[in-house]
Structures are given as structure tokens and as C-alpha cells.
Curated annotation (Swiss-Prot):
Residues 404-853 are annotated as: Pocket. GO terms for biological process: cell differentiation; negative regulation of G1/S transition of mitotic cell cycle; regulation of transcription by RNA polymerase II. InterPro entries: Cyclin-like_sf, RB_A, RB_B, RB_fam, RB_N. Residues 404-605 are annotated as: Domain A. This is Retinoblastoma-related protein.
Length: 1008
């Protein structure tokens, strides 16, 4: 296809020029710029016309809100959807399609958009046009669209390209220092630049021909490291940025020659076995595509191989020679062009070309947009921790100094490889004892179930005909090997955590008979799904993104939410990154997924809240019966040869996208350090006042959590469904409290406003629960803020609330741009006809009519409690003044959320560690004293809790090194801090006069 030029940006407003002009511009975009044929144009125009009314009502919400940019976004969305969903299967139509094909990167180039902004705005288009796309392309349209997979692939390539650039720059010089003359220097620079491009193009060829479906981040990193090995032994030694005699960097074999692959494994945390296998695959790609003759490196006398152990290395005589490098690049370019014709929306060469205008400079993270209000690089945005170092910090090796998403993934994979992989693939002796102690021996049932479920999650390709030698056969074989390895890892992790849970459960129940739990089908599937999700998260696959494990195991988000906390608690050495992943999943489940149609939470809710049954049934929210094991096995067998079809539940109502936000972890009796990004902490759990410490320590047995909702709870005098719903609601309230507090701090509102918003949210959850159905909890929180502001006569507009919400780490635009409303309700029949509206329309038409009586009760004492008093009409400008303080102080209803939540990390000494926010940490801890603190998320060793570093810190404090100033650490036990001191320093009392240690000071601690 010829190079495409941008369209003329001089367009008029869609509301001014009318639909006909918009259609003409869209036709010119398609036919004039993308050279589409008449058939493709007709199909694109059909989708455009059916969605045109949605564009008219939502144009101002797209991008920056300018008419021309909004049109460009909508054109790109329409063409992307049409192309992805209208692919033909028969040969003739496929041939026509290839002749008339256009790629997403070409659409964006014409529209003057970039990938980051495109993926940022795409979710709200999907939510708005979902019913239209379903009618035109079938109910499985979202699965075939693969928008999340494309976004994850883009993020991975961004990370991999930066990893490759950093590694190449570290290993090789930009020019050779000993050359003389300007032309020689230029030629030298061109050669290194071409070598750099050659490495990336060879990596793309490896992805196309060797990695097939499972292009996970760990496998791709192994591929890049294998290419670095090939570059090292083929690029002339004079361009190296290192010396083979550098003993600190390289692993020596027999104290003489360097083991190159082992050295690279040490540098980049790769598996040596996997790297050696990947090097073999890379050599095959070089041999077959570039037609190079391989020879054993041990038989070559090239100077590049000096001081290198040449055993098992392959050398290509003319590879990367200046005379042939240009032609080799042309061959790789042609090979990639051929692959792009068949499949691919993203030209992966863009990452080596540094086309910032097309790639974008904002950040995408983990398949979800990270809305921070500032533009930062992808690698720094997705980096899980901020590394803090100082001259006094404990020693860290150079490879650990910089934490990036790639290095974190490789470290996590190393944990899976070294801790989990050596375990047995069968239940241990102790676990078998629990399985045999049930009313009947369930060992065989557990083994059979695990095999079926894990084969459904990690399916094998069809067995190819051994008489046919083809690239497909090779990739299918590697797919099967990859899937089998992941199945084994998930299986071993499942047995390991299951045994730990059984042991803990037996202590709670004072017996080994766990029949109710170990015969519960739903519990085992949740455990298998959790184990598989951790394996997938470790390898960071593109093709299996959450919630795929839910769909393939037949469970729901509510089911999985019951085991996540227990899973984390009973797998002590779980790396921090995987803890964060599970915590973020739990938060996604709580904030929206559990409220979606088809959630088993509604089945429990009909038992716990019978008055909601009619509304739940009217909206069709109940979950379908869980598919049997036989049905899953049959589906997996029928799908052999490809990924099993993922049945998408009808979740279009209320679908609000994936929100990233602070994470939630543990309970009070866990002896693990809470991460700084947790959305609650052990101390916060206590201060929330939802459950006392005793009820937490004596937590309900897991078998009660997975029992039938109608079954009476053995100890609580209520049904198991009521217990499950109450526990779930308590988690929702905790999450809402932290998010409300974050918004209050950002907007600098008073404690009274915070308490009223929190109380209103609690009352809505308890008394107007149906407002949460098919919605996101942030939508309710935002409406609570505005309603409380109106009733408190506070000058705060919805625009200001949304402006500040967009700065929150968990924000996504579709939360306030697409709120579900029930078109079948009588109050909506004469409205716009949309089932998703903006949050202001939702507030006026749905929220206020339902919540007004609750709001009126929260009005300050000096405000008349008139039911019609200023709680609606959110489109009007707020002109009221600030709310005076109530006449008399009262005990705060809002849970205390101190900035520095102390965690007791020693059973012997009163030693606390506080997870400071980064802003507080930078302000309170000077550069010279950072080594005295264990900062949450920081550690001197891989996948180790930072609390383990306290011993090293105390040893430094108790050492003989003199400290500047007049302090004498030899006369006090600096490792001990009294409980009362911590309590006096850190607890917020929120108006509880005389009831706490801080009351004597008379001064209130200010939150950040």
C-alpha cells in the first residue's frame, strides 16, 4: 500500500454542519486516504450511520473535545472495528481482503492520532456501541475484536524495545574510538546503527516464526537475550563496551574462558536452560531466513570468540559483516512485510524507529490506561517500585539497582522457576492425608479436576501430521511445550497452597475432616483459577488476559473474590509483584466486576436481601449454573488445535472498563509487611471498625464461604449467603473509605464533608443496594460527593469533582462518561434511548430520585430539611457558600486512615514499620538517613519482604560507626519503640475528645 497522508484537519463542527457533511468527510477518509474499495466503504458507512447518533451526543467527550479530533477518533474506531470483525474465512474473500487491507497504524497515521490516545479512548466507544456491534457482527464480537490483547501487545513491545535499547547501549559503543577521519566515524556509527536495527528485526522474525500464539513477556525477553548473545559473538570486538576479563560481570568456566550464556542469564535473570533452547531457535531463524551456513564456534578462529567458551555456540561466517549487513536487513524487512500482510495491526518496526508521533508519549500500563495527568515514559510508568538508594544503603548488585517491568517479570519468573517448579506434580503426603480423611477419599477427584481445568486454561494445539514438515508444525510443537510447562507450574502451586489452606482450616475446626471444603467444586476451581492467573501474570501473556481464567473455569468474579485473600495469606514467599497482582484483581472484582450481570453475588443477595429479588430477576442478573467438568472437558477437546472459545457473559450493561488503583492486602494477624500501594492495611482494618480483632483472628472457615447460600451458618445464626454478602459489603465499604479519603485530600475538603459522603455511601449500600447493580462503585462515590456538596451548601461543581477524580490513580474516563441506566424503567422511556449516559444525567434522573431522602437526613443542623432543597439540578452552577460547622462536636463516623499506618513486624520487640507515601517519605526522610528505614516495596533481595531487612538495619544502627551530631546511639536501644509512642504519634482521633492518646495535645494531626 502506498504511503498514506493525513487528512485535511480543517473540518467544521459536527453539530454545525450536519450529518451529510460528516458522512462526506468519512467517505473521503475511507476512499480517498485509505483507498478502500466500494464494498468495504459500504460496510464501514453502515456501521458509521448506525452509530452516528452516539457520536453526536458524545463528541465533546472524545480526546481534547475539539470537533475535528472527535471525528478522527470516531472514524478510527469505526474502521478498526469493521476491519477486525468482518474478516472473511473463504479463500476468495480473503484474497480480496488482503488486496484491500489496511492496518490500525495506517488508520492512526492518517487520522493524526497515536496508539496511546487511541487505546485510552477506545473503551468508551466499545461501551456505547456494544449493542450495535453485537447486532451487526454477532454476540462474540468483543472476543474477536481483541482490543485488550492488542493493547497488551503494544505495552509489551514498548517495554521490550526499551529493554533492548538499554542493553545494546550498555554492551556496544556508538562508534569505534580508534577510527580516524570524519567519514570513517560516520561509517562506524552507521554500522552500529544497522547492527542495532538488525537485532530488532531478527527479534521480530523470531516472534513470527518461533513464538506463535504465546508471545509472553518472559519468552520474548529470552528471545532478546539470545539475540544479544548472537550480536556479541558476531559484532567486531572493537565495538564492545566491555572486556571479557571483567570478572565482576562474566561467569568464568574453569577460571579461564567466559561462559557467555550463563553470564547473560546472571545479568538479565533468565533461565539458562530456556536461554539455550531459545538460542537454538534463533540460530534456525538465521539459517532459514537469511540462508546463512552455520558452523560450530569451537572450530572457528575469529577474534570475536577469544576468551569465550565456544561449546554449544554456533557461528555464522558472514553474519553482520559490513558488506552483507544491508542485504540481510532487506531480507528481514521483506520477511516481516509478508507476515504483516497476513496478520498484524501494529508495525512493530515503529519501536526501533522512535516514531513518537504515532506511538505516543503518555503511558499504558498492563493492558490498562494509567491516567496520571502527566506524560511519562512507558517503562517508568509501569515500573512497580521506586528504587531508593543512598551511600548508606545496604549493598545492592548493579543488576538490582534499576527496577523495570521487564526486570521485575524476569525476577518473578525466577521465583516460579526456583521455588515452584521443583515441587512434585502430585499431592504431597501431607495433602494426601487431608484428602483421604474426608468421608470418602477424594484424591483421584482432585487430580482429575485439576487436569481438566488446567487443560482448559492452557490448551494444547492439535497434533500435527508428522509427515508434513512446516513452520506451523514447529510452532504448534512449541505451543504445546509452553502450555504443558505452564500447566505444571499452576498445578504445583495449586497443590502447595491447597495444603497450606487445609492445614490452617484444620486448626480452625480442630480436626482433619474437611469434607465440606474438599468436596466443594467451586472452591477447587477458584483455587485452580488463582494459581493459573499467577502463572499467567508471571509470564505476562498477551493471549490470556484476565478474566479469561474465570470464563474457562466456569466461575464468577464473586467466587474468586472469596479465595484471593486466603491465597495470599497461605503462600508466604509469594513475590511482591504477584501479591500486587492479586490485590489489584481483588480490587477490580470489588469495584465493578462483582456487580456485573451474571455474578453469583446476586444469587447470594436474593437470600440475604429477599426484598431485592424482584429487581435482580427483572434485570436478569442471576448467574447461570456452573458448567460441569464434563462440559468443560468436552469443550476443550472440541477446541483442540486452537484456543478454546471463550464464552463471553453478557456484561454490556454497566461495563465500565478496568480501573487500576491502590491495592488491598491483609488481615491483622498476618505477619507480612503491607505494601505502600495497598488500599488498606492491618491497622486501617482495625480502625475501620467493621469487624473487631477477635472476629478476624477467628475468621469463618472457608467451607462456610463456599457453602450453599441457603445453608445455615454453623456459628453465626444466619445463612451462609448472608455471611458472604455481609463480608463482601464490608470489603466494599473499606475500599470506598480509602477512595473517599483520597478525593477529600485532593480537593482539600473538611472532615465533616468526608464523614457525610462516607455515611451516605454506607446508607446507599445498605438501603439502596440496587443503585450498584451493573455499575462501578466510583460512580456512586462521585454522585455522593456532589449530593453532599449541594445539601451542605458547598460551592463544588460536578466538573470540579470529575477534574480531581481524573487525577486519582484508579480513574478511567468511561466511569463518568458511561453509566448504566435501565431503559426499561418507566422513567426512562421518553428519554434518549441510551442504556449508558454520562454521570450528570445519571445523577439527575436515577441517583437523586432514589437517594434524596437519605441526603436530606445528612443536612447540617442549620440547613432546613426540605426534601426539595438543592439536591438535584447538577447542571446548574453552584452558588451556595461553605457549610458552617455543626454546633457541637460528635464522634466521627468515618474510619481513621492515618498517613503512616504502623505495622508491628517483630514478635519480640516493639518494632514498627510505616508504609509512607512517596511524598511524605521524601519530605520526612533525609537523604543521609534513608538507610535507617525499611521502605515498603523496597528490599535488598529478590522476592523478599522488606521487613526481613530490619535485622541488617538494626545491625547498622548498633554498630560502631560514628553518627554526626550529638546523638549517642550506644546509650539507648534504638531498635525499640514503645507502643504508646507509636499510638500517640500516628493515630487520628477525628474529634474524639479525650478518648485517645492524642487528645492531650489538643492539636489534630493533618492528613496529607
Amino acid at each position: 500500500m502506498e504511503d498514506l497522508q493525513p487528512i485535511n484537519p480543517n473540518t467544521d463542527s459536527p453539530t454545525e454542519t450536519g450529518a451529510t457533511t460528516i458522512e462526506a468527510r468519512f467517505s473521503d477518509f475511507c476512499k480517498g486516504r485509505l483507498t478502500m474499495d466500494d464494498n468495504a466503504l459500504e460496510e464501514a458507512m453502515k456501521l458509521f450511520n448506525q452509530s452516528k447518533h452516539l457520536f453526536m451526543t458524545n463528541a465533546s467527550a472524545l480526546g481534547s473535545g475539539t470537533p475535528e479530533e472527535a471525528e478522527h477518533y470516531w472514524f478510527a474506531f469505526i474502521l478498526f472495528s469493521m476491519k477486525r470483525l468482518s474478516k472473511k474465512n473463504d479463500g476468495e474473500d480473503a484474497a480480496k481482503s488482503s488486496e484491500n487491507s489496511f492496518k490500525l497504524y495506517q488508520i492512526l497515521r492518517v487520522a493524526k492520532l497515536n496508539f496511546v490516545d487511541f487505546f485510552k479512548e477506545l473503551p468508551q466507544f466499545i461501551v456505547k456501541t456494544g449493542p450495535i456491534l453485537s447486532n451487526l457482527y454477532g454476540s462474540d464480537w468483543e472476543t474477536r475484536l481483541q482490543a485488550k490483547e492488542l493493547q497488551a501487545n503494544f505495552v509489551h513491545l514498548s517495554l521490550l524495545s526499551k529493554f533492548y535499547k538499554r542493553a545494546f547501549k550498555t554492551l556496544f559503543k556508538a562508534t569505534h574510538e580508534n577510527v580516524e577521519g570524519q567519514s570513517a566515524v560516520a561509517n562506524s556509527a552507521d554500522y552500529i546503527s544497522n547492527c542495532h536495527r538488525f537485532g530488532w528485526m531478527l527479534f521480530l522474525a523470531l516472534r513470527v516464526h518461533a513464538f506463535s500464539r504465546f508471545k509472553d513477556l518472559v519468552t520474548c525477553t529470552n528471545g532478546l537475550v539470545s539475540i544479544l548473545a548472537i550480536l556479541i559473538i558476531h559484532i567486531p570486538a572493537r565495538f564492545r563496551n566491555f572486556s571479557m576479563s571483567d570478572s565482576s560481570r562474566f561467569v568464568k568456566k574453569d577460571d579461564k574462558v567466559v561462559d557467555l550464556l550463563a553470564s547473560l542469564c546472571n545479568m538479565y535473570e533468565t533461565s539458562e536452560d530456556e536461554l539455550r533452547k531459545t538460542v537454538v531457535r534463533t540460530n534456525i531463524v538465521v539459517e532459514e531466513i537469511l540462508k546463512k551456513d552455520p558452523s560450530m564456534a569451537s572450530e572457528c578462529t575469529n577474534g570475536n570468540l577469544d576468551n569465550i567458551d565456544t561449546d554449544d555456540l554456533t557461528y555464522f561466517q558472514d553474519l553482520l559483516e559490513e558488506q552483507s549487513l544491508s542485504s540481510d536487513l532487506d531480507v528481514l524487512e521483506k520477511d516481516y512485510d509478508d507476515a504483516m500482510l497476513l496478520e498484524g495491526e501494529l508495525d512493530e518496526r515503529l519501536f526501533i524507529n522512535d516514531e513518537e508521533s504515532l506511538l505516543g508519549s503518555s503511558s499504558l500500563s498492563g493492558g490498562a490506561i494509567n491516567m496520571t495527568g502527566t506524560k511519562r515514559k512507558v517503562d517508568s510508568m509501569t515500573s512497580p517500585t521506586k528504587t531508593i538508594t543512598s551511600p548508606l544503603s545496604p549493598y545492592k548488585s548493579p543488576s538490582k539497582m534499576i527496577s523495570t517491568p521487564v526486570s521485575t517479570a524476569m525476577t518473578t519468573a525466577k521465583w516460579l522457576r526456583t521455588v515452584v517448579s521443583p515441587l512434585s506434580s502430585f499431592p504431597s503426603v501431607d495433602l494426601t492425608r487431608f484428602l483421604q480423611s474426608c468421608d470418602k477419599d477424594v484424591t483421584s477427584d482432585v487430580i482429575k479436576r485439576a487436569r481438566i481445568i488446567l487443560e482448559a486454561i492452557f490448551p494444547s494445539s492439535g497434533i500435527p501430521d508428522r509427515t508434513i514438515i512446516s513452520n506451523t508444525q514447529t510452532t504448534n510443537l512449541m505451543d504445546n511445550i509452553w502450555a504443558e510447562q505452564r500447566r505444571l507450574e499452576a498445578l504445583k502451586l495449586y497443590y502447595r497452597v491447597l495444603h497450606a489452606m487445609c492445614k490452617a482450616e484444620s486448626q480452625i475446626l480442630h480436626g482433619n475432616n474437611l469434607t465440606s471444603l474438599l468436596t466443594n467444586e467451586r472452591f477447587h476451581r477458584c483455587m485452580l483459577a488463582c494459581s493459573a492467573e499467577l502463572v499467567l501474570a508471571t509470564h505476562k501473556t498477551v493471549t490470556m488476559l484476565f478474566p479469561a481464567v474465570l470464563e474457562r473455569t466456569g466461575i464468577t468474579a464473586f467466587d474468586l473474590s472469596k479465595v484471593i485473600e486466603s491465597f495470599i495469606r497461605h503462600e508466604e514467599p509469594l513475590p511482591r509483584e504477584l501479591r500486587r497482582h492479586l490485590n489489584s484483581l481483588e480490587e477490580r472484582l470489588l469495584e465493578s466486576m462483582v456487580w456485573e450481570k451474571g455474578s453469583s453475588m446476586y444469587n447470594s443477595l436474593t437470600i440475604a436481601r429477599p426484598n431485592l429479588s424482584n429487581e435482580i430477576n427483572r434485570l436478569g442478573l442471576l448467574a447461570d449454573p456452573m458448567p460441569s467438568l464434563d462440559a468443560i472437558a468436552l469443550q476443550c477437546n472440541m477446541s483442540c488445535g486452537g484456543l478454546p472459545p471463550v464464552p463471553k457473559r453478557d456484561t454490556s450493561p454497566g461495563k465500565s472498563g478496568e480501573i487500576r488503583s491502590p491495592k488491598r492486602v491483609c488481615n491483622e494477624y498476618r505477619s507480612v509487611l503491607v505494601e505502600r500501594n495497598s488500599f488498606t492495611s492491618p491497622v486501617k482494618d482495625r480502625l475501620l471498625g467493621i469487624n473487631n480483632l477477635k472476629s478476624k483472628i477467628l475468621s469463618p472457615a472457608l467451607q462456610s464461604a463456599f457453602a450453599s447460600p441457603t445453608r445455615p451458618h454453623p456459628t453465626r445464626g444466619e445463612t451462609c449467603g448472608e455471611t458472604a454478602v455481609n463480608l463482601f459489603f464490608s470489603k466494599i465499604v473499606k475500599l470506598a473509605a480509602v477512595r473517599i479519603n483520597g478525593m477529600v485530600e485532593r480537593m482539600q475538603l473538611t472532615q465533616q464533608i468526608r464523614e457525610r459522603v462516607y455515611c451516605l455511601f454506607q446508607q446507599i449500600l445498605g438501603q439502596r443496594t440496587s443503585l450498584f447493580f451493573n455499575r462501578h462503585i466510583d460512580q456512586i462515590i462521585l454522585c455522593c460527593f456532589y449530593g453532599v456538596a449541594k445539601i451542605s451548601q458547598l460551592s463544588l461543581t460536578f466538573k470540579e469533582i470529575i477534574f480531581n477524580y481524573r487525577k486519582q490513580p484508579h480513574c478511567k474516563p468511561q466511569v463518568f462518561r458511561a453509566v448504566f441506566v435501565d431503559d426499561r424503567s418507566s422513567s426512562r422511556r421518553s428519554k434518549t434511548g441510551q442504556d449508558h449516559v454520562d454521570i450528570i444525567m445519571f445523577y439527575n434522573e436515577v441517583f437523586i430520585p432514589s437517594v434524596k431522602p437519605l441526603l436530606v437526613e445528612l443536612a447540617p443542623s442549620n440547613v432546613p430539611k426540605n426534601p426539595n432543597n438543592q439536591v438535584s439540578d447538577s447542571n446548574k452552577k453552584d452558588e451556595s457558600g461553605p457549610c458552617p460547622c455543626p454546633g457541637s462536636p460528635k464522634v466521627s463516623s468515618f474510619p481513621s486512615l492515618p498517613d503512616m499506618s504502623p505495622k508491628k513486624v517483630s514478635a519480640v520487640h516493639n518494632v514498627y514499620v510505616s508504609p509512607l507515601r512517596s511524598t511524605k517519605m521524601d519530605a520526612l526522610i533525609s537523604h543521609g538517613s534513608k538507610s535507617y528505614y525499611a521502605c515498603v516495596g523496597e528490599s535488598t533481595h529478590a522476592y523478599q519482604s522488606p521487613s526481613k531487612d530490619l535485622t541488617a538495619i538494626n545491625n547498622r544502627l548498633n554498630g560502631t560507626r560514628k553518627v554526626r551530631g550529638s546523638l549517642n546511639f550506644d546509650e539507648v536501644d534504638v531498635g525499640l519503640v514503645s507502643d504508646s509512642l507509636v499510638t500517640q504519634s500516628l493515630y487520628l482521633q477525628n474529634g474524639q475528645n479525650g478518648k485517645g492518646p492524642s487528645s492531650s495535645s489538643g492539636q489534630e494531626l493533618k492528613t496529607e
